[in-house]
Swiss-Prot record:
Protein name: Uncharacterized protein encoded by LINC01548
Residue ranges, annotated region (Disordered): 75-94
Low complexity bias locations: 79-94
Gene label: LINC01548
Domain of life: Eukaryota
Organism: Homo sapiens (Human)
Amino acid sequence: MLAKGAEEGRSGGPRPAITLPGSLHFTCDLKTSPYCLTRAELMEHLPLRVAVHSMSPCHRSCFCGELKRGHPWNTPQVSSFPSSTTSLSHSCTTSHLDCSQQVESGSK
């Protein structure tokens, strides 16, 4: 009874392999700015282990949107990082989010 709050917190699912801080958020609005976070910029904010191991396959991609815990890649304009390195590296290689294409299509 006393641990009701803690039990509710644990009932959401399995523990993620890596937990990102809940306050870690990036926003990228392609309508107002075609600017996207690069791998180097993400490495400044993500835990180094996540950045090195998970972002390596994605060095040609940009990442727009929000970083949230436990969410898979969503849409090209609002995307989120899942919390496990395995699903992060898998998602980024299969993601439709490619800022270089979006930016170049506007300038070419």
